[in-house]
Structure formats: structure tokens, C-alpha cells
């Protein structure tokens, strides 16, 4: 074994190198002798005897392999003949059995089954024998081919230099054997026997053999696979059909969307949408918010299918998740007291409640909505809402009318119908609320109830006396006359209306009033309209939400629940809701918070859209108007209703020249933040029934801010008007103070034409502007250059005196002209 290894490792080639050094003498270009050393190298490669013997042995083995292959073919042919012979014998047996089956009619079915089984068994055995023989032969051929191929590969590298003919001969034998084996494997459809080349030689040979084996496996798999994994013929051709039109996806549009967002959803440029809307007659910018209908028209115009999405799906789901099929019961009427200033609304309600609250109200005006419920003598209940009587509280009175069932219109018998009385009638009609007229102050000597009925006829308030359906009840809030009759009239009207509500279930109502209490936080007065509001319920109220921590009635008493038509003060909301917001009890606090946040975001979006629209629409008009003076005001009041009413009244004071800008408003006392805002915006601070804390007062003093306190709205509006009047641009009026008639004209080398005049009216002053009149037409307007009486320069000349007048830059004075002297007077303006 060791000798064989030594033989294998013995060198197969022998290289002989020979070096010869020689010195050559020569003459350089300069004539000097020069010696040059020359080295001659010779190399000769001699092939060893071992290599020649290996080549001869390979030839012999290749010849033997060919002979063996011929013998194997003979054996295969012999096996084939044997199989055919067996098949012929099988056919004979089948024929014999068939004849036997024909002869025997009784056992036909049994014989058929037996024959089929025997046929299958014979066929299986024949196939098994043939398959085994073929596999054995193929295995032997593969092993022989593998051995010679490996030997051939190793000899190819060694015999390239000396004998090319032997190389081609040896390689052809191995290649032919390999190809023959591949053909057999392909014919049998088998992929188990793979032709693998030996790992011999360097790394390049290993990589090459590995690639060849992978290629062989892929080729055999391609031939065999004909099922779903069969590899198709690669034509290296790909086809791409260009779509006939652009694929347009569905566009989901919410209630509002910006132009940029719509362009992104439609996968087009925003300029395309702007062009489309310009064709439709709309001018928009890329960041402008458009409504759902406009976005739908634009998208459909550009060929997209639109899917409209309701953004308030969660809100609707929360609102609809309520108790159903609850039984309705009769409820107490909600009555709103309306009327003119000082006609006795609060005094009337005060007498009904048997509590003195009207005396403390400033100026006799109810400053914010109060809600009370009382019981009549027969045990029935009535809820009263008291709205302010001043015209500035229009929004509050309208809000009270929306929450009410019956309106009691209080009219003083001695005063008659007044402007606020007419407004109250209009609000009642807008709310479709029936009227009951209470003619107050009938105890006064000058009272005339019939005149009140006559005046109300002009406003379509027809009493039952004249064939109408409005009840007129004469009362006296001071002496208590007719109060029971008024309550009976209210109950009678409520029976006609058949007022009902769900008593058991989740409550809903409306916010009558709200304010921020320093100790208790946000406080909201809620009128329950249906269901029962319990302590601990989760209430969603406009932009705010919260759990009811405490409930109090109008007397400040803690209560646990409140049914329909009961007003209560609720604590526990996240913020101060707006008066008039709908209050609803919901099941889930988390969903209530989500709805409240959604409403806040929606309000901001709508507000932004309005601002952008106003900017676009008023851009050119604002440029034409120029600068408009603005009076910045910060309003703080005790309740939300007063804040809204004051802000509305201030906006109505705005004129074309001076505008009132409310930079901040809120409920509660004046804080340091309010004072800082006023200093930054140069605003007037207005406190209505509130005061500034110590920190705010310190900022106000340091910044010299104008802070004013009020308890009556008349005084507030009058002082704001005065401040606005001071901001108006003053008017200038020209007053003629003197008139002089030209009697003669003199020439002066220094002053030019000098007019000798007689002062006919008023007074002529040197420094005042003048006009030159000719035939009562102004021909020049300028100023006097000199004024002399005789030789003396004077400052003024009175009527009836003569004087010399030199007009500056004007020498065309003629006899008969009139010189009119005037002065410009500033006239203060007022709103």
C-alpha cells in the first residue's frame, strides 16, 4: 500500500534546466572597450515512463469497457426476448382460460375475477423482473462510466503537453460513456442516478464539477417533470400589454377635505383639481378646505368613483345606544317668562316662588338665566325659566325659547307694548311656543289692560275676547293679584299640548346656563327633558364630558336624581359647556371623551374653513378699504350667557371705520393670563360682575392696562361707544371768518399786485387761508403774503375798515373781486 502511494505521488514529469554564463568584449560608441556578461538558460521537460504506462493502460481499459458494453447490450436484448417470450406464454394462457371461461357458463363471474387477479400478478412479476434486470445493468454501466470518466479527467491534465491525440481519444471514450448513460436515464425517466464527477485536482475542478452536476440534475428534472411542477420550455420572451386607460381607484371622502388631500387620494396633481374647479366656477387654493358635496362633484367630474364617509359615525352610535321601548308619562310644562325691561318678570316669578331674589339684581335687570320649579296648590309642578329683558340678551332669550313649552309674555298695563315685547313675540313664534299674556301692574291707577290687548292685536297676538286662542291674565306681582289664575292658565295650556316624556331611562336635556366656579369648577345648569339624570351618570355636553359628581336644585340642596322638566346644577364636567348645548347621558366614558374630542376638532376645522373663505372673499375689499381702526377688548363675566350677550352687543357696535375686536372672553375672574393678553394686544379689559385677583392687579398696574368693572350692561356699552368715538378720524370743517371786497389794485416792486380792499364782513387775519372769488366763483385758493393798514403791518382787520392785501403767488387781482378768509375747524365725531 505504501508503494502504491509512493508511485502515485512520484513525479510524472521531469524538467531539466541549464545555465551558461559568457563574457563578450566589445567597443562602445566612444571608442573604449567594454565587456558584457551574457547568460544562456536552457530548459527541457522529459515525460516519465510511468505516465506512458498509464496512458497505455487507459487505452486497454477503454477497449475492455467497450467490449463489456457490447456484452451488456446483448444481455439486455436477451432479457427483452425473454420478456417477450413470457408475454407470449401469458397470452397463450389467457387464450386457454378464455376458452375455458366460454365453456363454463355457471362460474363466469368467479372465473373473471380469478383471471384478472392472475393477469395482474403475472404482469407485476414480469415487470418486476424486467425492472430489476434493467436497474442492475444500468447501475453497472454507471459505475464503469464513473470510474473511467474520473480516470480520464485526471489523465487529461497530465497529458496535454506531450500527446494530444491520446488525450482526445481517451476523452472521447469517457465522454461517450457519460452521454450514453445520460440517454438511458432520460429514456427511463428516472432522476435518482446522477452522473457525478470525482473531486480531484484543484478547487477550480471542484467548482466546475459541482456546476456540471447541478446542470445534470436540472436537465433530468426537466425531462421527468410533466405535472404541475414541470418546467416549461424557456423561450426568453416576455410580453407587456399597455393598459388602455389609467386605473382609477375609489375615493373615500369625509365631510370636509382639503384640496391637497383630495389630490393625494385621486393620485393626481393638486393643480389638476384647481383647474377643474376653475372650470366649475370655483377659485380655491391648495390648502383650502372644501365640503363633501363639492369634493364629490370634482371627483366624479374627473372620472373617479366616490365613497362618502360619515365622520360622525361614532357620535351617532353613542347617541343611538339608548334605552328603547320605554313608557312615556305626562311631564310638567317648561315656562319661559319674557317681556320688556322693568315690566316685572322677575318680580312675578319671585312672588310665585315666595323668595326675594329680585331686589339684589343690578338695575332691575336679570343678568343671566335662572331656572326654578314650583308646585301649585293642587300638587302639579311647573318649571320656570327667567330670561333677561334687555335687547342685548337676544341670543339668551332665543335659547330659552328653544327649551320651553309655553311662553308667558309679561306686559306692564301702564306701559304697553315695547320693543323688547315685540322681540319676545317673535322668539315665541320662531320656537312654535304658545303664548300666555300676563298683564302686570294692574294695581296702578294708570293701568289700562284693554290698551295692551289692542296693541298686541297689531302683532297677531289675539286674545280669547276677540276670538283668538291667547289667554290674557291680569296680575299684580307686587300685591299677588291673579297669580293663581296665571298658574291655572299655564296648566290648562299644558293639558292642550299633551306634554309627555320618558321618565325611566337615560336622561337627555339642554344646558340653560354654565359658569366656572372657583371652588367647584365648571358648573352647568341642565334642564332635563327626558329620562332621569342620576348622580354618577356620564354626561356628554357639547365639547365637554364628565361624570356627575354632584347635583343641586335651584335652592342649593343636594339631590340624587332629577326627572323630566327639572332644572339642576351639575358638577363634574371637563370644562364649561356653551349655553344651549345638548346634554346626553351615555354608557361609556371613553366613547364620550372620543366624541367630545371629535367635536372639538370638527369645530376647529369649520372655523379654519370660515377664516380661509373670509380671507379669499374679502381680500380685494380689504385692500380697497385701507386700514380700519380696531378696538381690542377682553370680556370676562360671571356666567356664559352674559359673555355671549356682551360679545354680540360689542360686535354690533362696530362701524365701517372702527371695529370692536374681542381678543378674549371667558367665564370667571380676571387672571394673570388675561392681563398678559391685554398687555400684548393693547386691549381694554371689561369685567362684568367679576374682579381681578392680586396677581392680575399687579400686572395691570405695571403695564398700565385699562380695566373697567361693570354690573349693568347699559354703562358698559356707553363707555365702549365713547372709547370707539375717540378712535374715529376727526372731521374738519371750513368756517368763513371774513370777506373783503377789492376796490383798487396797486403795483408793488416787491409784492407785485396789492389789492386795496374794504372788509365787508367778519375779520381778515394774516395767517389764515384765503380764496379769491370772481363773480362768486373761486378762481384761486392760497394764503395772504402781506396785510397792511396804511403803512403799518397788521395781523387782522375788522369789518368796515380798509386795508391792503398782498396774495402770495397770485398777481391777477382785479377790481370787484372778493377775498374770502376762512379757517379749518376740527369737529369731534361720535358713534
Curated annotation (Swiss-Prot):
Residues 330-500 form the tr-type G domain. Residues 1-11, 49-150, 157-166, 201-225 have a biased composition (Basic and acidic residues). Residues 339-346 are annotated as: G1. Residues 476-478 are annotated as: G5. InterPro entries: EF-G-like_DII, EFTu-like_2, IF2_assoc_dom_bac, IF2_II, IF2_N, P-loop_NTPase, Small_GTP-bd, T_Tr_GTP-bd_dom. Keywords: Cytoplasm, GTP-binding, Initiation factor, Nucleotide-binding, Protein biosynthesis. Residues 22-31 have a biased composition (Low complexity). Residues 364-368 are annotated as: G2. It comes from the Bacteria. One of its GO terms (cellular component) is cytosol. Residues 440-443 are annotated as: G4. Residues 1-236 are annotated as: Disordered. It is found in: Cytoplasm. GTP binds at residues 339-346, 386-390, 440-443. Residues 386-389 are annotated as: G3. Residues 190-200 have a biased composition (Basic residues). Belongs to the TRAFAC class translation factor GTPase superfamily. Classic translation factor GTPase family. IF-2 subfamily. One of the essential components for the initiation of protein synthesis. Protects formylmethionyl-tRNA from spontaneous hydrolysis and promotes its binding to the 30S ribosomal subunits. Also involved in the hydrolysis of GTP during the formation of the 70S ribosomal complex. This is Translation initiation factor IF-2.
Amino acid at each position: 500500500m505504501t508503494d502504491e502511494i509512493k508511485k502515485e505521488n512520484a513525479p510524472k514529469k521531469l524538467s531539466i534546466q541549464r545555465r551558461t554564463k559568457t563574457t563578450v568584449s566589445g567597443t562602445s560608441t566612444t571608442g573604449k572597450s567594454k565587456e558584457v556578461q551574457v547568460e544562456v538558460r536552457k530548459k527541457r521537460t522529459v515525460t516519465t515512463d510511468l505516465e506512458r504506462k498509464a496512458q497505455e493502460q487507459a487505452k486497454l481499459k477503454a477497449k475492455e469497457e467497450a467490449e463489456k458494453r457490447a456484452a451488456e447490450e446483448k444481455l439486455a436484448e436477451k432479457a427483452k426476448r425473454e420478456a417477450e417470450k413470457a408475454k407470449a406464454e401469458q397470452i397463450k394462457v389467457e387464450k386457454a382460460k378464455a376458452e375455458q371461461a366460454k365453456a363454463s357458463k355457471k362460474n363466469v363471474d368467479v372465473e373473471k375475477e380469478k383471471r384478472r387477479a392472475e393477469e395482474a400478478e403475472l404482469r407485476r412479476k414480469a415487470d418486476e423482473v424486467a425492472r430489476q434486470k434493467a436497474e442492475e445493468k444500468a447501475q453497472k454501466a454507471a459505475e464503469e462510466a464513473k470510474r473511467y470518466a474520473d480516470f480520464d479527467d485526471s489523465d487529461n491534465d497530465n497529458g496535454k503537453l506531450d500527446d494530444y491525440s491520446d488525450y482526445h481519444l481517451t476523452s472521447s471514450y469517457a465522454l461517450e460513456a457519460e452521454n450514453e448513460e445520460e440517454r438511458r436515464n432520460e429514456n427511463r425517466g428516472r432522476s435518482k442516478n446522477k452522473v457525478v464527477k470525482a473531486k480531484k485536482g484543484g478547487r477550480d475542478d471542484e467548482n466546475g464539477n459541482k456546476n456540471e452536476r447541478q446542470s445534470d440534475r436540472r436537465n433530468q428534472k426537466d425531462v421527468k417533470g410533466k405535472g404541475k411542477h414541470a418546467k416549461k420550455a424557456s423561450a426568453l420572451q416576455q410580453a407587456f400589454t399597455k393598459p388602455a386607460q389609467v386605473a382609477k381607484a375609489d375615493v373615500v371622502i369625509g365631510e370636509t377635505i382639503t384640496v391637497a388631500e383630495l389630490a393625494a387620494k385621486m393620485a393626481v396633481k393638486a393643480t389638476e383639481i384647481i383647474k377643474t374647479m376653475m372650470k366649475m366656477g370655483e377659485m380655491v387654493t391648495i390648502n383650502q378646505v372644501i365640503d363633501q358635496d363639492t369634493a364629490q362633484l370634482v371627483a366624479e367630474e374627473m372620472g373617479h368613483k366616490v365613497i362618502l364617509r360619515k365622520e360622525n359615525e361614532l357620535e351617532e352610535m353613542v347617541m343611538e345606544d339608548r334605552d328603547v321601548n320605554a313608557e312615556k308619562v305626562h311631564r310638567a310644562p317648561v315656562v319661559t317668562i319674557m317681556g320688556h325691561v322693568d315690566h316685572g318678570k322677575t318680580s312675578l316669578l319671585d312672588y310665585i316662588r315666595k323668595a326675594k331674589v329680585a331686589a339684589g339684581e343690578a338695575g332691575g335687570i336679570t343678568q343671566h338665566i335662572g331656572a326654578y320649579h314650583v308646585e301649585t296648590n293642587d300638587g302639579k309642578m311647573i318649571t320656570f325659566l327667567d330670561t333677561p329683558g334687555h335687547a342685548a340678551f337676544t341670543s339668551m332669550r332665543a335659547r330659552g325659547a328653544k327649551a320651553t313649552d309655553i311662553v308667558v309674555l309679561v306686559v306692564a298695563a301702564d306701559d304697553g307694548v315695547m320693543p323688547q315685547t315685540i322681540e319676545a313675540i317673535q322668539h315665541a313664534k320662531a320656537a312654535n311656543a304658545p303664548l300666555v299674556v300676563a298683564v302686570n301692574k294692574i294695581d296702578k291707577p294708570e293701568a289700562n289692560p284693554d290698551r295692551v290687548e289692542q296693541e298686541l292685536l297689531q302683532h297677531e297676538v289675539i286674545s280669547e275676547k276677540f276670538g283668538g286662542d291667547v289667554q290674557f291674565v291680569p296680575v299684580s306681582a307686587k300685591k299677588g293679584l291673579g297669580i293663581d289664575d296665571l298658574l291655572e292658565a299655564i296648566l290648562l295650556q299644558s293639558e292642550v299640548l299633551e306634554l309627555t316624556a320618558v321618565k325611566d331611562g337615560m336622561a337627555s336635556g339642554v344646558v340653560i346656563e354654565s359658569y366656572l366656579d372657583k371652588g367647584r369648577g365648571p358648573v352647568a345648569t341642565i334642564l332635563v327633558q327626558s329620562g332621569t339624570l342620576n348622580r354618577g351618570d356620564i354626561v356628554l355636553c357639547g365639547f365637554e364630558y364628565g361624570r356627575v359628581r354632584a347635583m343641586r336644585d335651584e335652592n342649593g340642596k343636594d339631590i340624587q336624581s332629577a326627572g323630566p322638566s327639572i332644572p339642576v346644577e351639575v358638577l363634574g364636567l371637563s370644562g364649561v359647556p356653551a349655553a344651549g348645548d345638548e346634554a346626553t347621558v351615555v354608557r361609556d366614558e371613553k366613547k364620550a371623551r372620543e366624541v367630545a374630542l371629535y367635536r372639538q376638532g370638527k369645530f376647529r376645522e369649520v372655523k379654519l374653513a370660515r377664516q380661509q373663505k373670509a380671507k379669499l372673499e374679502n381680500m380685494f375689499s380689504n385692500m380697497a378699504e385701507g386700514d380700519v381702526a380696531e378696538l381690542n377688548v377682553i370680556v370676562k363675566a360671571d356666567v356664559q350667557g352674559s359673555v355671549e350677550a356682551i360679545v354680540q352687543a360689542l360686535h354690533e357696535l362696530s362701524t365701517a371705520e372702527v371695529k370692536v375686536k374681542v381678543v378674549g372672553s371667558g367665564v370667571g375672574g380676571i387672571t394673570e393670563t388675561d392681563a398678559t393678553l391685554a398687555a400684548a394686544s393693547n386691549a381694554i379689559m371689561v369685567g362684568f360682575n367679576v374682579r381681578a385677583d392680586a396677581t392680575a392687579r399687579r400686572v395691570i398696574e405695571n403695564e398700565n392696562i385699562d380695566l373697567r368693572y361693570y354690573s349693568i350692561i347699559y354703562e358698559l356699552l356707553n363707555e365702549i361707544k365713547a372709547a370707539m368715538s375717540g378712535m374715529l378720524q376727526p372731521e374738519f370743517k371750513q368756517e368763513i371768518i371774513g370777506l373783503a371786497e377789492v376796490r383798487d389794485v396797486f403795483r408793488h416792486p416787491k409784492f407785485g399786485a396789492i389789492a386795496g380792499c374794504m372788509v365787508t364782513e367778519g375779520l381778515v387775519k394774516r395767517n389764515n387761508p384765503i380764496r379769491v372769488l370772481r363773480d362768486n366763483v373761486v378762481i384761486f385758493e392760497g394764503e395772504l403774503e402781506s396785510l397792511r393798514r396804511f403803512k403799518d403791518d397788521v395781523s387782522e382787520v375788522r369789518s368796515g375798515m380798509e386795508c391792503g392785501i398782498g396774495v402770495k403767488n397770485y398777481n391777477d387781482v382785479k377790481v370787484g373781486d372778493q377775498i374770502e378768509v376762512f379757517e379749518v375747524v376740527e369737529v369731534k365725531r361720535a358713534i
